[in-house]
Regions:
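Extended alpha-helical targeting/anchoring segments
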Residues: 1-433
């Protein structure tokens, strides 16, 4: 049986907020929100919201990979939504993850939704899985008619985060990483630190709304999987497949925008920064190598090198690398060669991941992993989980992780301040610290 597809005649933003409000009634849900950023020529939708599950897979590294592949084959003609933990790396390489983990997400969670609402150029479209009963389908459609106009709530949300490591510990680690670079073990490494709150009860939907209002981003995500929540303002695409074309768009290089004539100078300074360009090009080379490892990959090329994209609060240096692959290649084949993304590891990739485990104190989990969809034709689109709040409602634990690329030219004090600056943008948003 085919899924039932119909159009919905409501304002897109009103519907999006309504769906967020009712999403808590489902055990699983996923919002992928581009916030109407027009610069992304590869984006097909303004937003997609998936609710409920017909089938799902909770997967950890110790499980057989065939379990994942069988799930994908069983649901080959279905839409699927997923999160991927950074620690899925341990399935593809001889690596480990033994640092503290208070979030306890699965290494991979994948579900086939009951309902999908897509906001595209033709308006709103509702797709109901063929396995949903007529009664449940009618009830869901009725909930959509109960849409309410947006009310701009000014609820006060106060969050006060603790630092997982001290400034002295951070700087000591940077010095050791620079030593590893000096002796040729690596060229560059992404080093991160965690900020956290224990014994806290939050409303993840309201947190996401405030995060997205303050920092609208092209790969924004809200994901609920039972007691686990992802609230992300990600600006970065990990990988996208459209037909036989794969696209990867790593970010390396960020500058805070100014609301004055000085903004153009800041943009040009980023564009011409030797340090930022060097970091970006190193990751481009790593991504090119990853894409070339994919079975049937050919004609790997850099379509954009160190281009500057401007967002409401920051300018970002983004490169675009593409390749041609066999159209029938699945996401599992692509993951084996490219995950985790090079922008969140360093180069050489495996050695950088070994040193990340050595110097960082928290298990990354979903941070620097990915959220995305696989459609009914096998095309997919995945983001990079950065600028993200992660929450375990059962453990009452909220986490934020920030970091940056470390090279031999890095100044430990400056790197610490940059990492703190990224965190403080969230702290100030929620009136804490």
């Amino acid at each position: 049986m085919q899924n039932k597809i119909s159009t919905i005649n409501y304002d897109s933003l009103d519907m999006l907020n309504h769906l967020l409000d009712i999403s808590d009634e489902f055990n699983v849900s996923c919002l992928l929100n581009s916030n109407k950023f027009s610069h992304d020529k590869y984006s097909k939708y303004s937003w997609i919201f998936a609710l409920g599950s017909i089938d799902y897979l909770s997967y950890n590294v110790g499980d057989k990979y065939s379990i994942l592949e069988n799930f994908l084959k069983r649901n080959i003609s279905e839409w699927k939504f997923t999160y991927l933990s950074y620690d899925l790396k341990n399935k593809f390489e001889n690596l480990t993850s033994n640092n503290i983990d208070n979030l306890e997400f699965y290494d991979l969670f994948l579900f086939v939704p009951k309902f999908i609402i897509k906001a595209g150029i033709k308006g709103l479209e509702l797709e109901i899985n063929s396995k949903v009963s007529n009664e449940e389908a009618i009830n869901f459609k009725n909930t959509l008619t109960e849409i309410r106009k947006r009310v701009n709530k000014k609820n006060s949300i106060s969050l006060s985060f603790k630092h997982r490591i001290t400034k002295e510990q951070y700087i000591e680690s940077i010095c050791k990483i620079r030593s590893d670079i000096k002796y040729g073990d690596i060229y560059e490494m992404n080093f991160c630190q965690e900020f956290y709150i224990e014994n806290t009860i939050i409303n993840p939907i309201e947190i996401y709304k405030k995060l997205n209002e303050h920092s609208p981003s092209p790969f924004s995500t809200y994901f609920k999987e039972n007691e686990h929540f992802i609230m992300s303002a990600s600006p970065e695409r990990y990988i996208k497949k459209t037909g036989s074309k794969l696209i990867s768009q790593p970010i390396k290089g960020t500058a805070k925008r100014a609301h004055t004539d000085d903004d153009a100078r800041i943009r040009n300074k980023l564009q011409n920064s030797i340090k930022e360009r060097a970091e970006n090009i190193m990751i481009v080379d790593l991504v090119r190598n990853d894409l070339s490892r994919i079975k049937s990959s050919e004609n790997v090329k850099v379509e954009e090198l160190c281009e500057i994209y401007s967002f409401p609060h920051v300018h970002q240096m983004i490169s675009t690398i593409t390749t041609k692959i066999n159209n029938k290649l699945s996401i599992s084949d692509v993951l084996k060669s490219t995950f985790p993304m090079g922008s969140m590891t360093g180069a050489p990739k495996i050695k950088a991941m070994e040193l990340i485990e050595k110097y960082e104190t928290s298990k990354r989990g979903i941070f620097s992993g990915s959220v995305g969809y696989i459609d009914d034709k096998g095309d997919f689109d995945f983001n990079v989980i950065i600028r993200t709040l992660l929450y375990n409602a059962k453990n009452k634990y909220l986490s934020l992780t920030t970091g940056g690329a470390i090279t031999y030219l890095s100044n430990a004090e400056q790197e610490y301040e940059e990492s703190l600056l990224k965190a403080e943008a969230v702290f100030k948003m929620f009136g804490g610290n």
